[in-house]
Amino acid sequence: SYAIFEDGEFVDRDKIEPKHFKKWVEFAKERGMGLDFNPTFFSHPKCDPLTLSSPNEETRHFWVEHGKACARISQYLAEELGQICTMNIWTGDGFKDIPADRLGPRLRYKQSIDEILSEPFDFNKVKPCIESKVFGIGVESYTVGSAEFALNYAAMNRGKCIPLMDNGHYHPTEVVSDKIPALLSFFSEIALHITRPVRWDSDHVVLF
């Protein structure tokens, strides 16, 4: 459930409001479902190609405002549906080639997430989480939101966010059977991405 909607009007991502997702709420209520919500930090002209880690302050501010808007929408979804809304923060920020500076982008990324989570929300209803990734197309050499970054951010910001384990975003020798109990030694709750594959592969597959 990304922050993309079709309602006969254009609203840029830093201006989206709960009212734009009223149909989502109606759909979920009819089916007795809750909803999670993901900010959408990709496929937009203001990806330069970085978003929350961009050195361009105008670009970074745009995406911070998008994240804050998504926090407000997540609060709305949780209140309307009476269920916890997990708000997953993931960006594709990174570089195809080896960067000279590996710290600067992560400091900007941290600052941006700090600013997003300064938006008021009820942590009993909204559970922000930071998703990491090993690498991807276009970010083969450096991913800003690495596993170490995401887990350390969650550890240092209890009461504002929880860890998220995307069960495909690991190095080849790492396994979910070790990662989940290791996290549960320190956190009372974690979020997971899990897929049951049928006729296709996915980066979220686990063994049952």
Name each region found by the language model.
Residues 2, 91, 196:
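Residues that line or immediately flank small-molecule/substrate-binding pockets and catalytic motifs
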Residues 172-204:
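A short alpha/beta connector and helix-capping loop motif
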Residues 7, 137, 172:
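Conserved protein kinase catalytic core
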Residues 1-20:
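Glycine-rich, proline-tolerant flexible connector loops at the mouths of alpha/beta enzymes
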Residues 14-158, 162:
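Active-site acidic/histidine proton-transfer and metal-coordination neighborhood
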Residues 169:
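Short, glycine/acidic-enriched loop or turn micro-motifs at the edges of active sites
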